[in-house]
Amino acid sequence: MIYNCKRTATVESCNYGTLAALKKENFLELQNSTFENIIEVFKKQICLYDDEVKMFLAFAMEKISYFKHLKLLTKQEIFHSMERVTYEKDALLCKKGDIATKLFVIQDGIVEVACKYAPRIDEEFVIERLGRGSIINHRSFMLEDDADTDFRCLTSVSCFELTADKIKEIKDKREDMRTAYRTVEEEVLIP
């Protein structure tokens, strides 16, 4: 409800547990009428969750230079804006010439980065094979740049996706994300 995503944490009960549910309309009523800053309090509490998926994403995303300088709440918003998607073997994540609209963080599987030798030769030259923790399009999806190569699933691939639209929503709300955008634009567009 807070991040408009399906999950914010994995909860395991080792002995027994009590489960409660709060409908979205009741949550919104609580937010609007009772506590002015309840969302921020909840977001700060979510930061304390020791969740395997969150830790994996945090570790992987720290490889991105602009991500390192973001505030913790901005990082959390990014994590919870990602969607887990599974692709079958031979599926294309990106095709050469297509506009990059998503950032991908590979959780499981192998993605092959390849290009054609020459227009008349049908064989592909494999540039690299990307595995768990690899990130695809971390800059180009922000700039809506076109892909220079094909990204094909060598095996079935499970990954987390962040759309350009979602990152723009975060940018509109968070000053540190706007700064990150400017940094990327300066690095890429200004020689």
Language-model region placement:
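Cytosolic regulatory regions built on CNB/CRP/Popeye-like sensor folds
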Residues: 1-191
